[in-house]
């Protein structure tokens, strides 16, 4: 459960760095383009995390480097660190167990299943905004405590893996048996720009739970991981928090049992910190002065640390053994009567009025206090459905332990994608449905098999449009955020993907490809679907006068329906796919922005997006067979006609609907309608950056380059989920 400081209610601003006034003449200063045009298309989102920002270079292989790691020694060092209390940030009860669990939780807890973004997979807690979120107060200290260990092991362990492993080791050190740990999270070197954290301009702005279902947001307030621990909008009412808790945990794909287990398990250890009013707390790390060296929230209250620490403003210790695993959370929750009170900082919390003083003080062994809980902890007792689960865990501690172990593993690995990406000696053998499991390959097609399959596909009567469209439909579900989707598994043939409106082509094409599969009884349908795209593109390139062999990596397998979580895969259904000129809803951003969103999920660069759209238009791959954007008189030929005709000044474009979504291109002299288009087409002529790219492919000398670039980008998309090739 998230804890937060409710006094951080405005965006942080650092002090002016100028000593003598005047204008800032440094690079990047001054009024920017987005200041003038705030709705400017974010093409820059496709350029983040390039090799230009990576100090390790493009040849660095994290999996190879991790294989050199002394994993046992690393865990030993982490265990020793847990009780190595530092005077600059003393450990509660002499242990950093609670702090490291919170660090791992808050790193993973930003994940949202609706768009697959967020999570712990990139080590984003090092960067703004997460490093300075109100809910992450004092986690800068946790990361700084880990630095000597990171320094020792260098690139053999990423920050992203280290954060989660530290949380696991903390749990194990408390006596808890975890479900396992999978490494494989690779660091990035700059903040993620694509994650939509919300449009609020003030920290802790309240959001209604119903609104969370309509947007890719994971928390009920800007700057929180989950919910306000004082109740919705500081209501102090446990029962009113139930909807918010379900909404936020549900956005991570957690059900009620997993939610109860995570809240209770996370609050079995450690404490919150609210020694005094938040007015004593200084600037967050991003706004702190340069001499603070990346640390923030310096406190002027007392020593500012230890017993005087202020983190969330709440002062809660849940259990009698805050550094050792127990079932005391549930025992205390149901054993005592709880009355609303306030922390020394003024935050709303609850105290067990009829309990003896049984909670140890974190720094004075001679002192004890009554059990305390957050408003949202009591939700587990007063919400009828949560209460049933909580009472079961109260009476069956082993069931609670098992549920928390699995839920914690899911929380910390949810954004890693299939288990093929996991590395390390503690990867669990069990396949879990949320990992989108795949069967083991039974057969690897030979080169002769591939030649015969291509011949069968070519002779099947399928059109170029159908072959290319079905391959794209299969592969384009991939999401770079949580590594879900893609062509491996042939889930296009399963529910729910086979029934999506955007995949209408599958109903016509898959039966043909399935018949071809039956004749071989060896190759997977997943491989055959991708191979159909290969055949279609090679035919289209040949028709354009370019002979090219499209690379194909066999080895895909076919998933079963029972390996496919229909509810979770439903989240992969696109709101829009500009590559196929598909748009389901008009109430979510602009068509061109959603094209950028889709391209970013597919990890495409701006040039790759541009060449793919141009190629797919002339191949006639619109989801509904429309002629929108098909700026060619020779469909099925892999030509540069899309770009040449879009940029041709003979045509004038005007909208044909009130929403400005559909357009006609008329001959300026005759008034004749030559082409029709959507915003996903015209953006390549209207946006200055995309027009510059389109001009490259519209030039007379670009034909062969266009085909080669299209094939390279196409193969990239087809192989995005081939983690078996790593």
From Swiss-Prot:
InterPro entries: Catalase_peroxidase, Haem_peroxidase, Haem_peroxidase_sf, Peroxidases_AS, Peroxidases_heam-ligand_BS. The gene is katG. It catalyses: H2O2 + AH2 = A + 2 H2O; 2 H2O2 = O2 + 2 H2O. Residues 1-33 are annotated as: Disordered. It comes from the Bacteria. There is a cross-link at residues 105-226 (Tryptophyl-tyrosyl-methioninium (Trp-Tyr) (with M-252)). This is Catalase-peroxidase. One of its GO terms (biological process) is hydrogen peroxide catabolic process. Binds 1 heme b (iron(II)-protoporphyrin IX) group per dimer. The record marks 102 as: Transition state stabilizer. Its EC number is 1.11.1.21. There is a cross-link at residues 226-252 (Tryptophyl-tyrosyl-methioninium (Tyr-Met) (with W-105)). It is an enzyme of class 1 (oxidoreductase). Belongs to the peroxidase family. Peroxidase/catalase subfamily. Pfam families: peroxidase. Keywords: Heme, Hydrogen peroxide, Iron, Metal-binding, Oxidoreductase, Peroxidase. One of its GO terms (molecular function) is metal ion binding. It comes from Salmonella schwarzengrund (strain CVM19633). Transmembrane segments: none annotated. The active site is at residue 106. Heme b binds at residue 267. Homodimer or homotetramer. Bifunctional enzyme with both catalase and broad-spectrum peroxidase activity. Its cofactor is heme b. One of its GO terms (cellular component) is cytosol.
């Amino acid at each position: 459960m998230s804890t937060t400081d409710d006094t951080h209610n405005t965006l942080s601003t650092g002090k002016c760095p100028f000593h003598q006034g005047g204008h800032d003449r440094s690079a990047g200063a001054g009024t920017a383009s987005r200041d003038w045009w705030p709705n400017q298309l974010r093409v820059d989102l496709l350029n983040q995390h390039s090799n230009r920002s990576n100090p390790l270079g493009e040849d660095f292989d994290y999996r190879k480097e991790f294989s050199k790691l002394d994993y046992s020694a690393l865990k030993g060092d982490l265990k020793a660190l847990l009780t190595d209390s530092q005077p600059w940030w003393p450990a509660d009860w002499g242990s950093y167990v609670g702090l490291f669990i919170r660090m791992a939780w808050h790193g993973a807890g930003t994940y949202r299943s609706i768009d697959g973004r967020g999570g712990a997979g990139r080590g984003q807690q090092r960067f703004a905004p997460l490093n300075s979120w109100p809910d992450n107060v004092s986690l800068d200290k946790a990361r700084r405590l880990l630095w000597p260990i990171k320094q020792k092991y260098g690139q053999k362990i990423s920050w992203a893996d280290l954060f989660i492993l530290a949380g696991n080791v903390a749990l194990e050190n408390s006596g808890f048996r975890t479900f396992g740990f999978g490494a494989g999270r690779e660091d990035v070197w700059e903040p993620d720009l694509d994650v939509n954290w919300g449009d609020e301009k003030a920290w802790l702005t309240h959001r209604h739970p119903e609104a969370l279902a309509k947007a890719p947001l994971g928390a009920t307030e800007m700057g929180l991981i989950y919910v306000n621990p004082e109740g919705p909008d500081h209501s102090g009412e446990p029962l009113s928090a139930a909807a918010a808790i379900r909404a936020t945990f549900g956005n991570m794909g957690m059900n009620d049992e997993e939610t109860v287990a995570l809240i209770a398990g996370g609050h079995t250890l450690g404490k919150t910190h609210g020694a005094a009013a938040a007015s004593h707390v200084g600037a967050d790390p991003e706004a702190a002065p340069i001499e603070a060296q990346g640390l923030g929230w310096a406190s002027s209250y007392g020593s500012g640390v230890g017993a005087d620490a202020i983190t969330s403003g709440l002062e809660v210790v849940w259990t009698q053994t805050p550094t050792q695993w127990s079932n005391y959370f549930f025992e205390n929750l149901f054993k005592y009567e709880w009355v609303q009170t306030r922390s020394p900082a003024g935050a709303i919390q609850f105290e067990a009025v009829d309990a003896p003083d049984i909670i140890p003080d974190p720094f004075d062994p001679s002192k004890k206090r009554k059990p305390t809980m957050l408003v949202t902890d009591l939700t587990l007792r007063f919400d009828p459905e949560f209460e049933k689960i909580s009472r079961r865990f109260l009476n069956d501690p082993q069931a609670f332990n098992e549920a928390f172990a699995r839920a914690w593993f899911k929380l910390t690995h949810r954004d890693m994608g299939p288990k093929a990406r996991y590395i390390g000696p503690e990867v669990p053998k069990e396949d879990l449905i949320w990992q989108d499991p795949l069967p083991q390959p039974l057969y690897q097609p030979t080169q002769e098999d591939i030649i015969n399959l291509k011949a069968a596909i070519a002779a099947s009567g399928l059109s170029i449009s159908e072959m290319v469209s079905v391959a794209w439909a299969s592969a384009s579900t991939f999401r770079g955020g949580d590594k879900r989707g893609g062509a491996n598994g042939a889930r296009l043939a399963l529910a729910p993907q086979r029934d999506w409106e955007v995949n209408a082509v599958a109903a016509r094409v898959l039966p043909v490809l399935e018949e071809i599969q039956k004749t071989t009884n060896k190759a997977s349908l997943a491989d055959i679907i991708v191979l159909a795209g290969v055949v279609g593109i090679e035919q289209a390139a040949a028709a354009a006068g370019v002979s090219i062999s499209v690379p194909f990596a066999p080895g895909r397998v076919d998933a079963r329906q029972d390996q496919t979580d229909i509810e979770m895969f439903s989240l992969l259904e696109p709101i829009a796919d500009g590559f196929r000129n598909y748009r389901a809803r008009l109430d979510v951003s602009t068509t061109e922005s959603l094209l950028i969103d889709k391209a970013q999920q597919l990890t495409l660069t701006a040039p790759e997006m541009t060449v793919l759209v141009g190629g797919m238009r002339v191949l006639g791959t619109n989801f509904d067979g429309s002629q929108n954007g098909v700026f060619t008189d020779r469909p099925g030929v892999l030509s540069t006609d899309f770009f040449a005709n879009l940029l041709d000044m003979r045509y004038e474009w005007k909208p044909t609907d009130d929403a400005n979504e559909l357009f006609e291109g008329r001959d300026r002299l005759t008034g004749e309608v030559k082409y029709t288009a959507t915003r996903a087409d015209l953006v390549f002529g209207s946006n200055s950056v995309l027009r510059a790219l389109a001009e490259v492919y519209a030039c007379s000398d670009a034909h062969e380059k266009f085909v080669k670039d299209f094939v390279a980008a196409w193969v990239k998309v087809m192989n995005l989920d081939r983690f078996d090739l790593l």
